[in-house]
Structure formats: C-alpha cells, structure tokens
Design a protein with these regions (language model features):
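Short alpha-helical segment of the dimerization/phosphotransfer core of two-component systems
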Residues: 32-37
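Short helix-loop "hinge" at the ATP-lid/N-box region of the Bergerat-fold HATPase_c
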Residues: 109-113
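Conserved micro-motifs of the catalytic ATP-binding
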Residues: 51-57, 90-93
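Short acidic helix/loop segment immediately C-terminal to the autophosphorylated histidine
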Residues: 14-21
Length: 208
C-alpha cells in the first residue's frame, strides 16, 4: 500500500541521514505518494457525497462549452493541452461535479498520451437528438479489450505502474461514472489499443 511504501522510505532516510542521494530520492517518492493519497481521499469523499440524498446542486449552464473551457484552463500538469469544440448547448448540471468529471477524464487522457509523439486530446460538446453529448477523445495508448468492461470499477488499474507513476489512484473513472449516473446519464467508453479512447456522456439539453 502507499502507506507501507512511505514508511519504508522514511525508515531508509533515517538509516542513511548522511546520504544526500538517498535522502533526495526517498523524499521525492514520499511526496509523490502523499499527493496520490490526497487525490484518493478527495475522490472517496466525493463518492460518499454522491450517496447522500439531494447531493446535486443543479444550475443552468447557458453554454456547455464554458464548462469545457474551464477544464482546459485548469492546471493540468502534463501535455498535450486539450482542444475544445462546442456547439453551445444549454444544460442543467451540478457545475462543480461536472467540471471534476471532465477534468478527471482529461487527466486520464493525458496519461494515455504520455510518451506518444503527436498524440492529441479533444473535448467536445454537440447536439444529438435533444441531448448535449460530451466527449473526451485522445489518440493515446488505448485500453486493451479485456480491461474495457472493468475500467469503471473502483481501484481497477489497466496498467498499475503507469497509473501510479502518473499519480493515478484507480478511482477516477469510477467517480466519473457515478457523477454521470447521478445526473441520469451514462458514461460510455470506446477504445482501441494503440489507437486511442473516447469517453461519451449525454445529458438532456435544456431547450428555450
């Protein structure tokens, strides 16, 4: 577990107080794992909040593209920077949770694109038959077909070493699916290994 590893590195630092390289590496690992635990705690609290009646604070968003732009402007920590395409749909969502969901999906897409030259991410919202359809598409590493049915399970990681190295906790997609479900929507994932992934969430568009 992260705590066991952190304790191990803390013991190593205590055992080698004069070894500057060991101190630097151990401190870096402890910092990284602490960040991962913080992200995990925040995600678990969000999941618990979704279980409470009346947890959603729905507001009318006159332009769903602004939600995508908000995600694009948040500190991402990695590249590529996503491109935004929006038809200006009007939606009623819990703005904070919806942005959290889109940001988690964007961070997942960025992890999938790491080390792949020319990889790209697109955040899109378009109208389809009275629905506002949000998609997060990447041209990253893709998800193996055998893993695809399980990726929204809490703590399930397709590539544990890759996910942990990038700060993942294995709960991001589970949280995204729960946020979508709380809005009466369904999160759907299509992916081809070595080609890329598209995540789709559709909610009713609010018509004038």
């Amino acid at each position: 577990t992260p705590m066991t590893a952190m304790l191990g590195y803390a013991d190593l630092m205590r055992a080698r107080p004069d070894d500057a390289e060991t101190q630097r590496e151990a401190a870096g690992y402890i910092y990284h794992e602490t960040q991962r635990l913080e992200n995990l705690s925040r995600s678990l609290l969000a999941l618990m909040g979704l279980d409470q009646a009346g947890a959603l604070e729905l507001v009318l968003c006159q332009d769903a593209g602004l939600l995508l732009q908000t995600v694009r402007s948040l500190p991402q920590g990695s590249t590529p920077v996503p491109r935004v395409i929006s038809a200006g749909c009007v939606v009623q969502v819990d703005r904070s949770l919806w942005v959290d969901m889109l940001r988690n999906l964007t961070l997942n897409a960025q992890r999938a694109c790491q080390g792949i030259e020319g990889a790209a991410i697109t955040l899109r919202c378009e109208r389809r038959a009275g629905q506002a359809v949000f998609t997060v598409t990447d041209t990253g590493c893709g998800i193996p077909a055998a893993d695809l049915p399980r990726v929204t399970e809490a703590f399930y990681m397709v590539d544990k070493s890759r996910s942990r190295a990038a700060g993942g906790s294995g709960i991001g997609l589970a949280l995204c699916a729960r946020i979508a479900n709380a809005h009466g929507a369904k999160l759907e994932i299509t992916s081809t290994e070595h080609v890329g992934t598209t995540v789709t969430i559709a909610v009713p568009e609010v018509l004038p």
